[in-house]
Amino acid sequence: ITVTIRKQEDVVRARPLLRQIDPGAVLAEEGRRFDLTLTEQTLRARRAAAVQQSIEVVRRRIDETGLREPTIQSQGSDRILVQLPGVKDPERIKRLLGKTAKMNFRLVDQSIPGADLHTSRAPPGSEILPSDNEVDRFGRPLLHLVRKRVMVAGESLEDAQATIDQGRPVVSFRFDAVGARKFGSVTQRNVGKPFAIVLDKKVISAPVIREPILGGSGIISGRFTTAAARDLALLLRTGALPVPLT
């Protein structure tokens, strides 16, 4: 990572802050430029930690499907071996393990009409993301202009369940105490504005905040089948993978 400090007088203040980014990195300095490089030892340790964390998430996801006696173990430095005797729907398991499932809640940027997003560039602080389950009249994924700043991260989700609301499959969710406070505060300040529920860089729902959501729970609605709602709830309950699996 290369960082250039704009003002020479800020270099002294920046130095200790940059060192705090990663104790396992080497910091080289030249004038107003700093180069932060991870050592091979640090990279190996991070890779091993990511594999171990991925194994734990994979095990939770498989356990939630009801499969018994799976074999899940690391193979080399960057592979995970998964053996599932008697699995009846291997494609579903592949889909579940192939999703990183990084979820967050963000505000929608309404500065550009949705119809213009296919030919527009996102303003600073926002990005254009495709819908996970909706298309426009040309058959293209519907686009959303979404703020980059995360309101509440998926790590604050405490539980998620597939259920039925007004005859449609939905996913109900509940935050932990910290997430509930953040979500309540943000929704209180943004009544009448749309917010996006983003999963793996795709918008799965973008409802309007009708009133403050202070109870720490809510519902994700979309064009879900019963099976899709069930699998989404499973992914949210079991947590996100630290890295994508291919």
What are these regions (language model features)?
Residues 22, 199, 214-246:
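Extended, hydrophilic extramembrane loops/domains of integral membrane proteins
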